[in-house]
A protein has these predicted regions:
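Conserved ABC ATPase signature
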Residues: 142-146
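Conserved ABC ATPase "signature" region
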Residues: 120-138
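Catalytic Walker B motif of ABC-type/P-loop ATPase nucleotide-binding domains
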Residues: 167-170
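Conserved beta-strand-loop-alpha-helix hinge in the C-terminal portion
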Residues: 222-244
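Helix-to-loop junction immediately C-terminal to a conserved catalytic motif
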Residues: 53
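H-loop/switch region of ABC-family ATPase nucleotide-binding domains
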Residues: 202-203
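A short, surface-exposed alpha-helical micro-motif characterized by mixed small hydrophobic
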Residues: 208-210
């Protein structure tokens, strides 16, 4: 059996050496899997994704990529660093982090040109992507003139153009309308069918079953409290309520009090 693309063994990470963000995380991710990371705000989801992308490094425990132990020193090897950046793509929760060039077109082609891809190949890839994402009319615009949905599409294009084997996405559908959400999910599933490993953090439990074949639930102690198949996680009302992923409503019927878990909706807010 091949090595997992990512393997974490008892991984811990703290900010400033005193604010725990990941506690004893164990996880193996195989090539071609669809992984969802769910949990309340502050539970460690984004920190985990940053670690997988080599933006931060474990304080304790073991972290490997395709069988190679990863540390800050690993990226001092230019050949390894370039290979990793070609194979692993990251889409940030805040698209503005990725969009820093004067125009959308320059943002999309920045990554592959930095990695040494030829201009003709880069242009061909860009043309295909902008058609797929329906962002042809945005190419000459400044990113700061775009809506959040447009920015997310451009950020996704700037990652997909590298053609990574592994795609890591932090809340890719947050704040999007249902049509744009559907478009992005369909694109991600097409990428998975084509062989890509997809790792997504999300609060939108209504997309989890479609975008996952394994789900990891993070609790407020910044550790994995449960992992399993999507249906087993999503049907565990107690688990979701205990980890602030569902409301629990109660009402009295005659002499009994009944409690019901209510899953958060990404595009729906209740007034209480």
């Amino acid at each position: 059996m091949h090595n997992p693309v990512f393997s974490l063994k008892e991984v811990c990470f703290s900010y400033l050496d005193k604010f725990p963000a990941l506690v004893a995380v164990d996880m193996d991710i195989q090539a071609g899997q669809k992984i969802s990371i769910i949990g309340a705000n502050g539970s460690g989801k984004s920190t985990l994704l940053h670690l997988l992308d080599g933006l931060i490094f474990a304080d304790k425990g073991g972290f490997s990529f395709c069988g190679k132990e990863i540390s800050e020193r690993s990226f001092e090897d230019i050949a390894f660093s370039r290979d990793f950046r070609r194979r692993v793509g990251f889409v940030f929760q805040d698209p503005d982090v990725q969009l820093f060039c004067p125009s959308v077109k320059e943002d999309i082609v920045f990554g592959p040109l930095q990695l040494g891809l030829g201009r003709n190949e880069t242009q061909d890839r860009m043309e295909k992507l902008v058609n797929t994402l329906a962002i042809q009319d945005l190419l000459d615009r400044s990113p700061n003139q775009l809506s959040i949905g447009e920015k997310r599409k451009v950020a996704l294009a700037s990652t997909l153009i590298i053609q990574p084997e592994i795609l890591i996405l932090d809340e890719p559908t947050a704040g999007l309308d249902p049509t744009t959400t559907r478009h992005i999910i369909d694109l991600l599933m097409d990428e998975n069918i084509a062989g890509k490993t997809i790792i997504t953090s999300t609060h939108d439990l209504h997309i989890v079953e479609e975008i996952s074949d394994m789900v990891y639930v993070f609790g407020q102690e910044r550790r994995i409290v449960k992992s399993g198949l999507p249906d087993s996680i999503l049907n565990d009302a107690v688990l979701l309520a205990e980890n602030n992923l569902a409301h629990v409503h109660s009402h009295r019927h005659k002499d009994k009090v009944h409690a019901h878990a209510h899953v958060h909706l990404e595009h729906h807010k209740e007034e209480h």
